[in-house]
Amino acid sequence: MNRTTAVGRIAVFAATLSAALLVTANSTAAPAGPRENWTSATSPHFYKTTSLNALGRVADSAANDGSALRLTLKAGAAANPGNGIEIASRNNYGFGSYSTRMKAADCSAQPRAGVVTGAFTYATDHSDRNGNGLPDNDEIDVEWLCAQPEVIYLTLWTDYNASNDQLRKVSRVIDLRAGRIISTCFSTTFGECVAVSSAENQPTSVAAIPGYNSSTQYYEYGFDWSATGVHFYLVNASGARVTLWDYRGPASRIPTKQSIFMQNAWHTTNWDPYGFQARERPNRDLHAHVDWTQLPG
C-alpha cells in the first residue's frame, strides 16, 4: 500500500501485534490452515478493526455458496486505511500459502474516486532486525485502485520510516486486461524505480485476461511465501492458475516476520492510477466483496 497513509493504522494495530511479530516465519511452507467461507459477517478467524463503515453478509449468485462478505466504505469516508473498512486475522501467520476469492470496490459511477482495495500481510514493530537503519515494515500486498480496475499492484515491503519516507520495497504493476507489465521496481523512496535482477523479474510477460475487471468479477488471488521468494498468482475464469510474479530476489528484500492477514477498502488522496489523477472522496457507499479467505497452517 501507499505508505504515506499507513501511519494512522500503525497506531491502531500496535496493541494487536504481539511479541509473535518478532519471530521469523517458519523456514518451510505449512499446510493449509483456517478457511473462512464467510457464512456470517463475524468470524472466529478475523475481526473488524475499527468501528467505522460496515461489514455484512449479502446474497451473491457469483459467490461459490451464493453469499459473500461485503465490506462497505461509506460515502464521504476520510483518507487513510484507519478510516476505511478493514478486517484482520486474529492470529499471526508466517511462510505458507494465502489466497482469497474477491471483487474489489466498484467506483464506475465516480471514475475519479480515490479508493484502494487490498489483501495483504502486515507486521511492523519499529525494530531494525536487518540492521539497515530503517524501521522494519514487513508486508506482502495485492491491491487495486478502483479508478483503474484492470491494473493490479503487487508489493513486498521490508522497511519504512514514516518520519522521512525512506523505505525498501520491490513492486510489480500489471495491466491484466492488456497483458502488459507496467513496471517491476526496487524503491528506496516513493516514486523511485530502480531496475531489478532477472531473478526478481519473472515471468517477463503475463498473458492478457480479456475483459479483466477486478471490481465486477470474482477472481481467486493468492501468493505462496517462503524464505526464498513470493509467488503471486491469479486463478482465471477457466480455473487455470496464472503466475503474475515469481519473485526470487535477495533475502534482504523478502519479508520474514509473522504477520496478520488483512483485507480492506479505503480512501486515498495521494495514490493516482497510471495516466490520470483520481483522488475524489467517495460520494456514495462503495463495496468490496469477499467470497472466501484461506490462511496458511
Each model region followed by its residue ranges:
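Bacterial N-terminal signal peptides
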Residues: 11-22
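Bacterial N-terminal signal peptides that target proteins for export
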Residues: 2-13
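Conserved short hydrophobic patches within well-ordered secondary structure
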Residues: 2, 25-26, 231-233
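GH16 jelly-roll
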Residues: 30-297
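C-terminal region of N-terminal signal peptides and the immediate post-cleavage residues
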Residues: 22-32
